[in-house]
Swiss-Prot record:
Residues 55-63 are annotated as: Caveolin-binding. This is Striatin. It comes from Homo sapiens. Keywords: Calmodulin-binding, Cell projection, Coiled coil, Cytoplasm, Membrane, Phosphoprotein, Repeat, Synapse, WD repeat. GO terms for cellular component: bicellular tight junction; cytosol; dendrite; dendritic spine; FAR/SIN/STRIPAK complex; membrane; neuronal cell body; postsynaptic density. Residues 149-166 are annotated as: Calmodulin-binding.
Length: 780
């Protein structure tokens, strides 16, 4: 029966509990089979199809979220990279622009120096090949310059580290001794002729010419005496110290080529200025000029030979070839040595003092170096310096101090500066020199200590051009009159941060509204409690000024408006207030000037020019030197002085105008000097003229602007005049010298008009300007 058993039998035999269930009945076997099926179903429930789908959906959603976060992060990083790249590009552009500016300024400075030298000495200043700066090559070589800069930086750091090591072990003194010995060998104090000539040949190969070696040898033989050798030792120690100076940037850049620098050039560059500064030295050296002259003829034949042969020929053939008495030369040399010793008793200091001197020299600013071409004209060798040596002056200075540094040990820095050969006034030449076109010298002018005015506030609330402005006599308060039919009052101490800049803006604290047309003029009383305005409506409105600290949003106060002064039938162009009599002067397009009593609203006290004999008045002012007089300008070009008490015209100022008036002779403004009997007029033909009130004669006339002069103002002390013009400029003038001491552009043009009015504050440090661009600007 076992062969025909079903699958359950085999499964039961394989089960661990099959033996126990085998002897049981059918019920037990059914129960056991049911338990096995339940266990298998529980195991399969963990991986059901809905569960798997849910898991996949959950993982997909998490993956999508992470990918979205990654995309956002990548976008942020890309934006940051783009921002940094843009910032880097902007910095590079800024650097290029600054480099171009530096090159431009360097080129301009070289031109100015050459021009100054030509004017002073009448000769061209040899500055090498001076070409205008080129910018295209800089951009092309930018990629090549960066690796060089990195290598130069590493080279400089390595030199700095090596310098510290040498200083720690005390090797600096050894270098000084070795170099001093080498200099003595080069200058002919050593008996090793072969080594000396080898050095000269090596120097000549570096320089590309052999004539310089002979020239240096001749100069050294004729000039170096005992005291001169002491000074040369000083100079050599200076050059050694310059090797270890942090200030020598050129030496760091060209450090790899330092070993092949032309030492003969160093000796010659130092010997020439020192030997050329003493008159006795020049006279003594003139005795040896024939040596140099004879040597010039042999340059060509000697250039192909060996350096050692030259020296031997010089030593052997000197007496025969030149036919000179050697005793005379020896006598001259001894005499020259005695004179030098008598003049300069220089004792060589010990090493510690010398090191202190060198340390002090590092703290002092480097003295200006001399071009070899500026040397004494009596020295033939000075004019025979090769051109490429002059061009390499900066490169040579990487190993040396300036030519006069040896004298600075003895004379001091200031005296050494004054004794620079041929330098003269060039010692004071700086980049800050003013242009030659200026007609005045600021340095010698007593205005050098004057105040410089700078813009402080921009008043922006008007909707049309501002025609006039007036300061409060005491408070920092300004009133402006505009073509938008309003006047506005500004407290210059109540500032608020501007919206789009770091500057401060001022908001108006009160707006005066009563005019029915553009307001053309405004004036304040002497105590600042009232102000008066005139406009195209022919009315003169009187106002009570409000408290400067008033809230701009307070309710309307009807007591501010005092009422109009009626009488004019056309636009009122100008007003002037008399503090002595509390009177108000006005001039109108109806051709009349009127005098008003400001204490009451009544008809005018007096009327002037009612017949329009002089034309239409354009401006009026009180004569400060005589309170009973007033001065007025007219459209026909006349300026007259009137007596307000007698109502008579007492004087007409001198004017060269035709009877047929035209726009070119129009006078836009007349003012009176606060302390002197002088009247000043601003003309349409760009002139400013000064008149004597006593005689009516013209004192001075000058073209002050590029376009019509529209406004004038004199400071309370009577020292400076301010003028405004339609050329958009404000100019400040010294009344004593009649020269412009400051100019600034304040406004933009509108309908070919720019600046309408300017004013000084009577007691505080403010000036203001009114423009056709609806802006008023305040300067401090």
């Amino acid at each position: 029966m076992d062969e025909q058993a079903g699958p359950g039998v085999f499964f039961s035999n394989n089960h661990p509990g099959a033996g126990g269930a085998k002897g049981l009945g059918p019920l037990a076997e059914a129960a056991a089979a049911g338990d096995g099926a339940a266990a298998a179903g529980a195991a399969r429930a963990q991986y059901s199809l809905p569960g798997i789908l849910h898991f996949l959906q959950h993982e997909w959603a998490r993956f999508e979220v992470e990918r979205a976060q990654w995309e956002v992060e990548r976008a942020e990083l890309q934006a940051q990279i783009a921002f940094l790249q843009g910032e880097r590009k902007g910095q590079e552009n800024l650097k290029k622009d600054l480099v171009r500016r530096i090159k431009m300024l360097e080129y301009a400075l070289k031109q100015e120096r050459a021009k100054y030298h030509k004017l002073k000495y009448g000769t061209e200043l040899n500055q090498g090949d001076m070409k205008p700066p080129s910018y295209d090559s800089d951009e092309g070589n930018e990629t090549e310059v960066q690796p060089q800069q990195n290598s130069q930086l590493m080279w400089k750091q390595g030199r700095q580290l090596l310098r510290q090591y040498l200083q720690e072990v005390g090797y600096t003194d050894t270098i000084l001794d070795v170099k001093s010995k080498r200099v003595r060998a080069l200058l002919g104090f050593s008996s090793d002729v072969t080594d000396r000539e080898d050095d000269k040949n090596q120097d000549s190969v570096v320089n590309g010419t052999e004539a310089e070696v002979k020239e240096t040898a001749m100069i050294a033989k004729s000039e170096l005496t005992d005291s001169a050798s002491v000074l040369d030792n000083f100079k050599f120690l200076e050059s050694a110290a310059a090797d270890f100076s942090d200030e020598d940037e050129d030496d760091d850049v060209d450090g790899r080529e330092k070993s092949v620098i032309d030492t003969s050039t160093i000796v010659r560059k130092k010997a020439l200025p020192d030997s050329g500064e003493d008159r006795d030295t020049k006279e003594a050296l003139k005795e040896f000029d024939f040596l140099v002259t004879s040597e010039e003829g042999d340059n060509e034949s000697r250039s192909a030979g060996d350096g050692t042969d030259w020296e031997k020929e010089d030593q052997c053939l000197m007496p025969e070839a030149w036919n000179v008495d050697q005793g005379v030369i020896t006598k001259l040399k001894e005499q020259y040595k005695k004179e030098r010793k008598g003049k300069k008793g220089v004792k060589r200091p010990n090493r510690s003092k010398l090191q202190d001197m060198l340390a002090n020299l590092r703290d002092v600013d480097e003295l200006p170096s001399l071009q070899p071409s500026v040397g004494s004209p009596s020295r033939p060798s000075s004019s025979r310096l090769p051109e490429h040596e002059i061009n390499r002056a900066d490169e040579v200075e990487a190993l040396t101090f300036p030519p006069s540094s040896g004298k600075s040990f003895i004379m001091g820095a200031d005296e050494a500066l004054e004794s620079e050969l041929g330098l003269g006034e060039l010692a004071g030449l700086t980049v800050a020199n003013e242009a030659d076109s200026l007609t005045y010298d600021i340095a010698n002018n007593k205005d050098a200590l004057r105040k410089t005015w700078n813009p402080k506030f921009t008043l922006r609330s008007h909707f049309d051009g501002i025609r006039a402005l007036a300061f409060h006599p005491i408070e920092p308060v300004l009133i402006t009159a505009s073509e938008d039919h309003t006047l506005k009052m500004w407290n210059l101490q109540k500032t608020a941060p501007a919206k789009k800049s770091t500057s401060l803006d001022v908001e108006p604290i009160y707006t005066f509204r009563a005019h029915k047309g553009p307001v053309l003029c405004v004036v304040m009383s002497s105590n600042g409690e009232q102000c008066y305005s005139g406009g195209t409506d022919g009315l003169i409105q009187g106002w009570n000024t409000t408290n400067p600290n008033i809230d701009p949003y307070d309710s309307y106060d009807p007591s501010v408006l005092r009422g109009p002064l009626l009488g004019h039938t056309d636009a009122v162009w100008g007003l002037a207030y008399s503090a002595a009599h509390q009177r108000l002067l006005s001039c109108s397009a109806d051709g009349t000037l009127r005098l008003w009593n400001t204490t009451e609203v009544a008809p005018a006290l007096s009327v002037f020019n009612d017949t329009k004999e002089l034309g239409i008045p354009a401006s009026v002012d009180l004569v400060s030197s005589d309170p009973s007089h007033m001065v007025a300008s007219f459209s026909k070009g006349y300026t007259s002085i009137f007596n307000m008490e007698t109502q008579q015209r007492i004087l007409t100022l001198e004017s060269n105008v035709d009877t047929t008036a035209n726009s070119s002779c129009q006078i836009n403004r007349v003012i009176s000097h606060p302390t002197l009997p002088i009247s000043i007029t601003a003309h349409e033909d760009r002139h400013i003229k000064f008149y004597d009130n006593n005689t009516g004669k013209l004192i001075h006339s000058m073209v002050a602007h590029l376009e019509a002069v529209t406004s004038l103002a004199v400071d309370p002390n009577g020292l400076y005049l301010m003028s405004g013009s339609h050329d958009c400029s404000i100019r400040l003038w010294n009344l004593e010298s009649k020269t412009c001491i400051q100019e600034f552009t304040a406004h933009r043009k509108k309908f070919e008009e720019s600046i309408h009015d300017v004013a000084f504050h009577p007691s505080k440090c403010y000036i203001a300007s009114a423009g056709a661009d609806a802006l008023a600007k305040v300067f401090v």
